[in-house]
């Protein structure tokens, strides 16, 4: 791929692969349903479900600020036509069709609270609205008679208005000490969510020491009830229609108490448990029908002989389907998996410097439908699968972004980058700082000391000229994180690149 600012890269896919090529009839978000505009004349951009051609259209800066933790790396997402940039300070929204529609929702409202973790922004539908969901790990030093406590905060934000529609704060621990390293301080391990309801399960671990044990737990939160439930000793893998799938057990290599389970989110009651006679399985991903885990156990510990599998747990029946790795066992460490919010799960092997594997699973059955390895010959396993959406897999090879059919694993042909940069019509006008009418209501906007203010879209002056695979996708396009470059980058932590859907 040509790395020059005068070149716009585009991925062109053939019709009939990985879903319908039909252009969406409405300004839909994730799910193809119409969305009520913030104003009657709110502008929209073309949408395709799923996007099958992507072109760089905008760059949104994520400003650095004094005191930022080295762990606070901006995370990108997209909900409907709003690009999302999240971090410890809060969540920024940039309407890709209307640069005047920008907002920032802070992660905390009390001076006694510090933030030590943030999830990536997640996109969901709540009451037909495109909503961003984000979770934070926080430490509150207490006030008056209140003891210091560890909190998990979940926010749901209407992306077209920049208003919070729900918020749930859940105390999960008592702190001994101050700061993010205090005993009892919560850390986010993973998140699982339901894109159809906005329900979320947050995996949490707490810091321990020789006298205070570390805890593992899941926090289930629902935007409709604005209530939460704590489920001890569980790491979540999937949430769908109020049902949580998760794993529990010991991490010791010789452990045999590893179990996968189903639970009711509202009550926290475990409804089904399936012992696997191995160490605790690793949650991978969740679809509408199944939750996915990776597990391994030694058959001869002294000889280092083990067997492993991907387990698909039916969210309704509790039935389990196993998929064995295609690689030799010595080359298998684990998998990273992504659900396409339709009927497919795509997984790639991780953690080894040897052979690599990619495979697809049918979420309807939980069974493997395709796959190949770097030993197969003739095909390259992508370096990273960055996103999957409605039948299309978005991935990055060493040379360029690529796309695969999520159901078959077949390549979706791409064209060479077109010459010339994006036209002025491709990029929103220079951004403006949100006015009081653009931003969230009083109490939703941070003070100057809370977070730097993103100054909106700066055109493509921050784009480095090399298009990459998006990490999040909606019918309007996708986003990815780019490191800042150039003379104007010293005050930036990163740049959010928006690639619009053109087909």
Please name every model-derived segment:
Residues 84-86, 143-151, 209-215, 251-258, ...:
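Short, solvent-exposed loop/turn segments at conserved positions within beta-propeller repeat blades
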Residues 93, 98-289:
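Long, acidic/polar, low-complexity amphipathic helices and coiled-coil-like
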Residues 149-162, 214-222, 258-264, 307-318, ...:
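Beta-propeller blade signature
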Residues 332-360, 367-421:
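Loop/turn-rich, solvent-exposed surfaces of beta-rich toroidal or solenoidal domains
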């Amino acid at each position: 791929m040509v790395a020059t600012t005068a070149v716009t890269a585009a991925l062109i896919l053939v019709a009939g692969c990985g879903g319908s090529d039909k252009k969406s009839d409405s300004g839909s978000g994730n799910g193809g349903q119409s969305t009520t505009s913030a104003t009657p004349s709110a502008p929209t951009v073309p949408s395709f479900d799923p996007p099958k051609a992507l072109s760089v259209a905008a760059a949104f800066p994520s400003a650095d600020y004094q005191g930022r933790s080295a762990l606070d790396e901006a995370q990108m997402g997209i909900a409907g036509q709003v690009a999302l940039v999240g971090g410890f300070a809060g969540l920024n929204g940039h309407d890709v069709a209307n640069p005047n529609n920008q907002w920032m929702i802070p992660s905390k409202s009390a001076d006694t609270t510090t933030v030590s973790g943030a999830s990536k922004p997640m996109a969901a539908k709540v009451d037909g609205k495109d909503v961003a969901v984000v979770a934070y790990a926080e430490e509150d030093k207490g006030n008056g008679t209140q003891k210091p406590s560890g909190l998990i905060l979940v926010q749901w934000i209407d992306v077209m208005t920049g208003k919070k529609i729900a918020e749930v704060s859940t105390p999960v621990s008592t702190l001994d000490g101050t700061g993010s390293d205090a005993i009892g301080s919560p850390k986010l391990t993973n998140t699982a969510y339901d894109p159809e309801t906005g329900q979320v399960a947050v995996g949490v671990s707490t810091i321990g020491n020789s006298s205070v044990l570390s805890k593992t737990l899941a926090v289930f939160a629902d935007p409709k009830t604005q209530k939460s439930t704590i489920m001890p000793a569980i790491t979540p893998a999937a949430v769908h229609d109020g049902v949580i799938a998760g794993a529990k057990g010991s991490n010791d290599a010789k452990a045999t108490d590893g179990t996968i389970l189903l639970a009711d989110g509202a009550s926290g009651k475990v409804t089904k448990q399936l012992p696997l006679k191995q160490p605790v399985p690793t949650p991978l991903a969740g679809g509408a029908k199944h939750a996915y885990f990776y597990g391994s156990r030694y058959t001869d510990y002294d000889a280092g002989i083990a067997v492993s599998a991907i387990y698909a747990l039916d969210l309704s029946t509790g039935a389990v389907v196993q998929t064995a790795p295609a690689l030799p066992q010595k080359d298998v460490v684990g998998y990273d998996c992504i659900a396409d919010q339709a009927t497919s799960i795509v997984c790639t092997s991780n953690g080894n410097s040897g052979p690599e594997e990619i495979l697809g699973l049918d979420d309807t059955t939980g069974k493997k439908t395709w796959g190949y390895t770097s030993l197969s010959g003739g095909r390259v396993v992508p370096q990273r699968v960055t996103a999957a959406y409605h039948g299309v897999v978005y991935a990055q090879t060493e040379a360029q972004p690529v796309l695969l059919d999520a159901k078959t694993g077949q390549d979706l042909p791409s064209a060479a980058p077109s010459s010339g940069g994006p036209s002025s019509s491709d990029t929103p006008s220079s951004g403006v700082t949100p006015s009081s009418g653009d931003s969230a209501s009083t109490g939703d906007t941070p003070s100057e000391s809370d977070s730097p203010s993103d100054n909106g879209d700066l055109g493509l002056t921050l784009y480095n000229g090399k298009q990459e695979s998006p990490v999040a996708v909606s019918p309007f396009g996708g986003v990815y994180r780019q490191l800042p470059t150039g003379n104007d980058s010293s005050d930036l932590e990163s740049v959010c690149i928006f690639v619009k859907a053109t087909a």
